[in-house]
């Protein structure tokens, strides 16, 4: 890994004729190495990837969330769903971020494990009777999209809708795009909702 850092450093030195730029790059590189290898592991955090940082940085005007809906032909057993959620979050490394929240300090973006994480805070059963698909879309547009997450908790919530037309049920999930992409989110929801057969 240090080999790649040295190549990158050499490249910057070749293109930089300004001494101040070279000093800036060397000092930034040193701070990055210090943070990544010595300080951040001590505080149980991990540096985010560039894509995580791109999709996780948000302002009041700019948020990047995925809202997904998956319907089922039968009623879903809630205790079984909670067990599967716990298993999947623990089993698959890519979903480990669901227990972390995103931070940025000194220009470094990183994930911090939430000290107060409980699955029950991210799971809500909705007992509202949905007369048709339009009522479901309205729930997603008005209720789910309007949720604001505090900065110190993982930015996701899963809703279980029990009373859809035809005795169907559904998952509706809102999650930060920095945690998952659309395909991995659908895979996650399908493994949580798969039947025993």
Regions picked out by a protein language model, each given a short descriptive name:
Residues 1-197:
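Non-catalytic N-terminal regions of enzymes
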